[in-house]
Amino acid sequence: MTPVSSDYRPNHIFLPKFRPDKITSECNTPQQQNVIAEGLYNVSEPFPIRNTDEERYLDTKEIHHTWDNTIKNVVRSIVSIKGSALRSFDTESAGSFCATGFVVNKTLGLILSNRHVVSPGPISARASFINYEEIDIYPIYRDPVHDFGFFRYDPSSIRFHDVTEISLSPESAKVGIDIRIIGNDAGEKLSILSSTLARLDRPAPNYGIDNYNDFNTFYYQAASGTSGGSSGSPVLDISGAAVALNSGGSNSSASSFYLPLDRVVRALRCIENNTPITRGTLLTEFLHWSYDELSRIGLPREFEYDCRTRVPSSTGLLVVSRVLRNSEVSKALEPGDILIAFKTDSHKSTYIVDFVSLFEVLDEMVGKTIELHVYRPKRGFLTFQLTVQDLHNVTPSRFLEVGGAVLHDLSYQLARSYQFSLNSGTYVASSGMLNWSSGTRDFLVTRLANKPTPTLDAFIDVLVQLTDNARVPMHFRVLGKYEEEFTIVTVDRHFFLASIFSRNDEKGTWDRQSLPPPQPSISRRPSVIPRPQEGSKSMEAIQNALVLVHCRMPYSINGFSSTKLYSGTGVIVSVVPPLIVVDRSVIPVDICDIRLTFQSMSAMGHLTFLDNRIAVVSCDYLPSNSVQLNFVADFLRTGDECTLAALDEDLQLLTKKTTVRSVSVVETERSSPPRFRYVNCEVISLMDSLASTGGLVFREVGDDREIVALWISVVHQDVGGKDYTTKYGLSMSYILPVLERLKLPPSARAQHVPTTAGVEWSHITLAGASTLGLSQTRSSEFYMKSRENGTIPRPLYVISHLRPLLHKTSLGVGDILLEVNGKMITRLSDLHEFETESEIKAVILRDGIEMEITIPLYPEYPTFSSRAICWMGAIIHPTHSSVFEQVEPDVDLPGPEGVYVGSILYGSPALNMLRAAHWIVAVDGHDINTFDDFYHMLLEKPTDTFVQVKQMNRRGATSIVSVRPDPLFWPTCIIERDSNGRWCTKHLQRKTKEVCS
């Protein structure tokens, strides 16, 4: 089948100019008959023609004039729709879209569009008329199968536009009629495409197995070349009536596909009469086969003759294509059965020749029994008594949101696509906590905590019995795979609000019901498998000291655009209190969940300390076989022998004796968007490494093992934006001072905050320094000093300013550092003894001249945020230090920290309005200087009106946007620690106290 795509997403394409086809003037042609039928000419008058030597052409001037009048009238009914799918649901993903609709009843305010526009899930949409007047529209009906649905608007809200309505005329659709498709094609507000209706019996287009697909209906086809944004456009004849609804198009040709309006008219009449729109189904997909195809599978020729005699226009019959697994009908019908007729209590035997004749009866017989007659090849004519199911009951209308995941009952759409039976499991539309990656979807949860979850209600019953952070087994099945899979998930009830949403079609909105709070957590110390101990000198002691650390970020913040699982190896550095040190790449941000996996147990971790190099994690308890290793604050030298001990993902200890290749300053490129990176850090490279998650480096001194470095991962970003990882050793000289500082009371820790000069250092060779003016005497001094230290003689020089907006420094790019407070500096570690000073006296080489300057030192600026606010779907937090590395020097940032947009969630009001990696500098004309200013502003801000936001990028360019809050689906929340140090999401309510979820 030719691949096709929905006209749902805008994509710009080139549209060739329209050239009207030549119309012959033969008096008996269909074209002339159509023109006469439309009343353009009096039959008694001569038919106007233009004579030439070879041909005669119909004068189309008056036809164009009529199309002009038609278009002038109908464009007042057509609206451009812009909206957002607020949550992933069924076959639809969260995100913004544009489409088309048209008014079919201006008194009730009804707009017709496609089902994939109206959407089965929650959406927020606005419609714009031709005069750019905008109104709110609310979805009130979407067909469970066919690609149409209705919006409703308030007619009294239209102030300046004279709305007309377009009548629906399915009977006017005929092969060969001229049509116009008017809509928001390619997002261009109003496009008019011309074509000729070519086919009325095309199979429903196939948009792909994971997407919404229509079935059990014919489609119309014409070469109109519609594209994204034209979904929901009316297919108009010359009288201005809609003969079909534009739905999709081909990727490889100009073919467009239109939905017939037979069932649309019925649904519209039900809405107008305020009666339920019943939809019946046999949970079976039918296809229309021609009589020749039917004869090849055994349909008797005499029966074909009878069918053609009864219905001369018939070209074939309906055939069973597939039946939903484990349904009642699956026990009766089989693929290949040919539908002949049916009989009901209120109908005589009626022959089935097309989809309309079938569903005219099924839609009226919901919950009742029909007698279906079929012809089965090799078996002959058979009769079955079948109960008509309610199609609405197999289409989900509610969902659960918990831990960032969206779950609902398995729909008929997906069950049909993958040949699953209904109630096979709870469908995951967005995974959240269930897979630690909110983008993953398309799997069924079949069991949770060892209990079956065939439906959403069963899943909720299990979930409410679980505690926050509980670790439970989950069985699931990925759609498209043949086997069930198994994993262990962590329940998250603290980072996200947990609610059940139910669709309310009367209001066109959704009702929200909060889930009961989780069961209280009970901390139990797990039993540990006893293992023989040989003291701290044994390799087993080292293995027991290594811990796998897993970190999950619930939101993309601080420049980290992925919420994937971060993992690495940490080292137990203190038994009492329990402390584990891990490198910063494993725990990139403060707002996260941490899980520690020891050799025989696992536990939740609590972040105690985070700086530019390491993270210190605590936990409630350690395994009883944990011991204190011997850590030494000493720098290795090039050529030193050492041993690398590391863990693989299976907690197996790997060791390798090796030699130090080099000791150098790590250099990393600035990333986009700005995020933490290792700077001003001296690292150790080894001759031989191991494929591992991390570990430690030790050296043997007699019978003792001295731990001298942590084996870490340094993540770089190349010019193409791709991350790659390099392993280095980080000296314990960076780690042990942090541990000593953590032993101090909180009040004393503030007096021992490390300071920085606000520049990035790197090495330069002596040859390069000599070119810049370094004297021979200085070169000799560097050479001799480096020999003493066992390093390569390379002075430090400034390669960039890290925070020019915050730290005014007397150092310039290219300055070579020679001395600090009278001490020669030959390596970066020589600066450690000055990191608590407020200023230093330095001798530098600048422009070939040695000079003495005073360098002010500043407290290190945080590289992470310890709290954040979710506002209209934007994750907002104080600016982290990496942003200031990539700011124009003359940018005037309000306030000392600024309010920074870390990320935008899909489907939120902020999507396509606010920009990630921008500052919010004003809201409704009020300047925002600090995070606290922003927080207090939100407590006073109403949530039912548009908000004007002024934002600024790192180049200082500003823009103003208007965003409308959505307190139902996107309430304002603050993410911070509670009094016990645990993460908690608090719902901010205007002029009321916070309520912790």
From Swiss-Prot:
GO terms for cellular component: cytosol; nucleus. Pfam families: PDZ_1 (PF12812), Trypsin_2 (PF13365). Residues 78-268 form the Peptidase S1 domain. Residues 870-955 form the PDZ domain. InterPro entries: PDZ-like_dom, PDZ_sf, Peptidase_S1_PA. Residues 507-534 are annotated as: Disordered. Residues 521-533 have a biased composition (Low complexity). It is found in: Cytoplasm. GO terms for biological process: proteolysis involved in protein catabolic process. Its main location: cytoplasm. Keywords: Cytoplasm. SUPFAM superfamilies: PDZ domain-like, Trypsin-like serine proteases. GO terms for molecular function: serine-type endopeptidase activity. This is PDZ domain-containing protein C1685.05. The lineage of its organism: Eukaryota, Fungi, Dikarya, Ascomycota, Taphrinomycotina.
